[in-house]
Amino acid sequence: RNRYVKKSLSCNVAPENTVLMTSEPKQIVPFTKSYIKQFGVVCSCQPDMKGEHVRMAMPNLPWFVGIDFKDGKVTYTKTYDDLKSCSVPEKTKLISVITSNKNHTKGHHDRLAFVEKLKKHYGDKIDVFGRGFNSFGDKWDVLAPYKYHIAIENSQADYYLTEKLTDCYITNTYPIYYGCTNAEKVFPKEAFLSIDINNAEEAIRKIDALIASETFENSGDVLASCKDKVLDEYNMYEQIARVCDTLDLTRPKERVTLKPMPKMFTWDRIKRELLSRNYWKLRSEPGI
């Protein structure tokens, strides 16, 4: 999943039954045409991937609640059974948002600018977590006590839906969401509020109306249904199993060799990346 074959890999398998599953947009993890052509099935959230063997699909990702990353160590604080049997947590706080103080790209810049406007508008009613703000170990602690969470994806595109949204459902938290443009293919439209962080004034008006209408209090059933869907239908293993169920196991096996990904980091690409990062650093400086 999202890892390139680093060395040639050979195995006995029907070529049609080799599977690649991607979980990042093209600008983060790109794949060449020659690389994806090696696989019989490609499940991808990258809309520009073409071919009869390509299936557009939401990323296959784990959830990040119930996992403590404190001090660089990974500790599992809640099992599947814990999450499945857990009742709705006590909601003592209003809104949380996770971001970081990184400001290298336009996406970083837009997200930070939006969060600053949220802080100015909501004051102590909103808690901001992430690098450069309030640190945390287990994402459960920044979702479970809150009625609402503002979930901001790293990019906005069809099919790019990550744990930023689904973790909200595991904690029975109502998501205010920027990201996947066809999320309603997976979750009902009444299960989240879609906003545009590039239009902060309109987004804040929508959030205010959401809170005023007590949407969280009136969404218990739909949030519970989405929680079950995340845990039972969209967990990693279930998604892999569904793909495997579509394969034809009667196809004859042969010796198949998957070749490594060609190098893509040319000097031109590196220069463009550095220029982009420095541009947004300069733009973020006061008076520039």
Model-identified regions with their sequence ranges:
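Terminal end segments
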Residues: 5, 27-28
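Active-site beta-to-alpha loop of glycosyltransferases that engages the nucleotide-sugar donor
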Residues: 24
